[in-house]
Structure formats: structure tokens, C-alpha cells
Amino acid sequence: MDVQVYLINAFADNKYLGNPACVVPLQNWLSSEQMLNIAKNNNVAETAFFIKKENYFDLRWFTPDIEMDLCGHATLATAHCIVKHFNYSDKIIKFKSLSGDLNVSAVDGVYHLDLPKRVPIKSELPEYIYQSLSIKPKSVLKSRDYVLIYDSQDQIEQLSINRILFDKINLDTGGVVVTAKGNECDFVSRFFTPQATFLEDAVTGSSHCSLIPYWASILKKDKMIALQVSERGGKLFCINNLERISVGGSAMTVSKKKMSL
């Protein structure tokens, strides 16, 4: 049996920027073990698997390590795959996932993800994570992810992590996002996951489920532009809605191949 694997860069219109995700269309679900092995073989942060139903798509996400409950950039990549490679003409792509119903709108090459809002609350950081940070945060919040607040974009860009200490903690599907006001945008961030194959994520849609409501309350605005200042980097168009958030960005297909199982 062969499967088709699309490599798609999300939150970028350049193959050297954004966050690469693999997208695998299926007729029926493979076993979780098979999908995890495919994700390991793909060697990118996330692989999305989808099945077309009558008027929606079932969607699951795997890192090389575990199945995730939500992945924004791989959802955006999947929407792009469906529109560009499966002649899908509806303006709204509907997904069903472990995080419930997710809708993506496609307008003029920009994909807007409708995602659940995760308002972070004040918290304390595990000591190993705190000690692993080269620059200490001024405050700590938590939702699914730990959200660390800093004073400047320079601090976010200069931050380094002692992985020996950082990897002493397992956050399951969660991670650590560091954030500050941006110099030429509303806010910036970076995202790290302990004990993961990839320490830093290039662009993370799901972390903005927490970042958007936080910065909306700080900046007193509901429409914002964010940059994830990883090595590859990416731009996100952010909207804070009443109960959910919207994250928008571009995508491009880099390659496609067949994989034998």
C-alpha cells in the first residue's frame, strides 16, 4: 500500500520560511502506530492525516513522538492541500478533530483558522524549566502551554535553553511559549517542547490560542499581527473573537511523494 505525502510550508509563501508540515490523505484510518511511524519517517514537526467525509474532513495530527490534540500549522497546511490539490472550491473547509470542530476559510491565498480560545492564567514554572532559561521571564501564565512574558523582542530573540535541564520535564502535548511586544508588529513569540524530537517549533498556530487573548487584553485591540521569531520565522494574522480566535497565514506546497507502507 502506498500513501501520498505532501510537504507544505505553513505561515509562509517561501519554501525557506514558515513551518513545514506533511499532509497525508487517507481513505481509511491506519493504526495509530502506523501513523506515528509515518510521522517519524517524515522528520518534520507535525504530520497531518485526513479523511474526506460527505461535507467535512476528519483530521488527526502526529509529531515524531506522540499524537497531538491540536496543531495549527498542520491544519493550515491540510486546508491548503485540500484547496490546491483536490479541487475543493468551498470557501470554508470543515474539520472534525480531537479539539472538536475546526473551520478554515480560504480567501485570496490566505487561510484563516478558527480555533478554540485558551485564556492563560497566572502560574508557577517548574524549577527545571526556570533554570534552563538563559533569560528569566517577568511573569508566568499557563493554559495548555506555559506562557512566559518578557520585556522585549530582543530578549525573545536572544533567549537560549539548556536542553539537559529542560528535558527533565514532560509536558505531554503542552510546551513553553515565550512572548513579548514586537518592535514592528503587535507581539512576537517562540515555542519550545521538552523531550521532543524538535526542541523549537518554527511557527506554532496552537500557541496563539493563548497568546491572542492575552495580548488582546494587554494591547486593547482584537486584530493583531504576530511574528514567530524562530530561525525560519513566520507571520500570523490574529483576531480575538468572543469565544474563539482566528489565526491566518499563507502556505505553499514544497513537494509531494509516494510512501510505501
Q: Where do the protein language model's features map onto the residues?
A:
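Active-site proximal loop and beta-alpha junction motif in alpha/beta enzyme cores
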Residues: M1-L70, L76-L261
